[in-house]
Amino acid sequence: MHMNKPLQAWRTPLLTLIFVLPLTATGAVKLTLDGMNSTLDNGLLKVRFGADGSAKEVWKGGTNLISRLSGAARDPDKNRSFYLDYYSGGVNEFVPERLEVIKQTPDQVHLAYIDDQNGKLRLEYHLIMTRDVSGLYSYVVAANTGSAPVTVSELRNVYRFDATRLDTLFNSIRRGTPLLYDELEQLPKVQDETWRLPDGSVYSKYDFAGYQRESRYWGVMGNGYGAWMVPASGEYYSGDALKQELLVHQDAIILNYLTGSHFGTPDMVAQPGFEKLYGPWLLYINQGNDRELVADVSRRAEHERASWPYRWLDDARYPRQRATVSGRLRTEAPHATVVLNSSAENFDIQTTGYLFSARTNRDGRFSLSNVPPGEYRLSAYADGGTQIGLLAQQTVRVEGKKTRLGQIDARQPAPLAWAIGQADRRADEFRFGDKPRQYRWQTEVPADLTFEIGKSRERKDWYYAQTQPGSWHILFNTRTPEQPYTLNIAIAAASNNGMTTPASSPQLAVKLNGQLLTTLKYDNDKSIYRGAMQSGRYHEAHIPLPAGALQQGGNRITLELLGGMVMYDAITLTETPQ
């Protein structure tokens, strides 16, 4: 009896050890080549690539996670995974013509599939496997080596997995198990990649879109396995802190849009001589139940962010020298977002450069970490309060390990008569603005409403977007009609009324006491009808109301939607300095 206890005590740990070792044991990274076919294996993960630069097998725990792939019937790539492509007047496949082994040691194997001349862009697709990491690091270098500009609507990596196994999508905010393409394509189609389900509800692949820089990871999971996109930094994505894109969607697809125009970002125009390194990011594979998978990838994401910039990457185009940029923005806004943009484009629609952003504390202080040396344009805008538009903008040079900018004086706000909403380039505070992305919300907004300053409530009486032709009225009183005022309208998004033909573009007639002041017209940012609830492409309008335009006592601003849809950030009436 006493002898059995020690035997039993030893037996359980031994059994546990035997079970765990295959999952955690690691060894040297091995590379096998057969022409342009390659296999990378570190004992935790084994990935075999074909000559076209896409994965043919992904082995984890004895299971090939891409053995059964699926997609839209019309998609020629529905049976491919881990591939790179771009859209420039049509889909352009990445067609590598050579494979380079850049580094091969027991700790790291670094390969690059390179397309020098088969497409409009010169592309390098780099694959890096390291010891002890159950995943594959990747980065892309895109260049225009031609003599004419190249317009690119999207440049992306697509990771497709077995949807019968990894059946759950997770975009870091919401999770779900949507129908697959072969089922969806039998249902009535509402619009682009949007279907009406048998229960009357609507599903769209855009339901699982998200804010790229806010999302630390996104992926697919199920039946004991998870696959995750883990970007250690978002500095190389297009747009700004509010850049949205597709992240995951049905058929177990993980997307990494290096640039994309689904939600207001314009097409990238790569001028001759353009070259940009995107990444690296980690495609991480793990095992466990759903809770364990998410907890594990969350820890992994924190580790990757803490390791940025990666010291193990030796590429002259990847700056490992970085600086911390700090300063203090003197502003009356409760908080502000401070942005550094390396390109000459407006920061919120930039596509060719790198972008860094940080939120000020209540004292106005900010710090941006890991900024490469160089010249940047600094822009700041309110993240709360009522001051619409840029607070400050200037050119800064980043040098050394620390760049201290000192105090930056923000534009002084004009005296405020009233405000609807918070000036933060988002519509969260309005009705439905806190809802998850879903097509239905745009159909539930009234065509006409009346909002009374001082009585109505933003959360209940003002909606995230004006989506139906009609008039929204703002009633307010003034005791000083002789004072000149400015009506400030910040638009968080402006979209067509859908993808039907013909579609109406966003047009908003602005009236004061029944008299037309102006008609605001915008290009289609494609955001609202694709389920965006907080933002798209930002616009602002400042409409002067000359002295005497207002009436003593009651006044009415009318916003008449003539076409398309508009999403509101904030509306204010301010005194015009004399």
Curated annotation (Swiss-Prot):
GO terms for biological process: carbohydrate metabolic process. One of its GO terms (molecular function) is carbohydrate binding. GO terms for cellular component: extracellular region. Its EC number is 4.2.2.23. It is found in: Secreted. Optimum pH is 6.0. It catalyses: Endotype eliminative cleavage of L-alpha-rhamnopyranosyl-(1->4)-alpha-D-galactopyranosyluronic acid bonds of rhamnogalacturonan I domains in ramified hairy regions of pectin leaving L-rhamnopyranose at the reducing end and 4-deoxy-4,5-unsaturated D-galactopyranosyluronic acid at the non-reducing end. Residues 1-27 form the signal peptide. Keywords: Lyase, Secreted, Signal, Virulence. It comes from the Bacteria. InterPro entries: Carb-bd-like_fold (IPR013784), Gal_mutarotase_sf_dom (IPR011013), Galactose-bd-like_sf (IPR008979), GH-type_carb-bd (IPR014718), Polysacch_Lyase_4 (IPR051850), RG-lyase_II (IPR029413), RG-lyase_III (IPR029411). Induction: By rhamnose. It is an enzyme of class 4 (lyase). Belongs to the polysaccharide lyase 4 family. PANTHER family: RHAMNOGALACTURONAN ENDOLYASE, RHAMNOGALACTURONATE LYASE FAMILY PROTEIN. Contrary to other proteins secreted by the Out pathway, RhiE contains no disulfide bond. Degrades the rhamnogalacturonan I (RG-I) backbone of pectin. Is required for the full virulence of E.chrysanthemi strain 3937 as it is involved in rotting of plant tissue. This is Rhamnogalacturonate lyase. It comes from Dickeya dadantii (strain 3937).
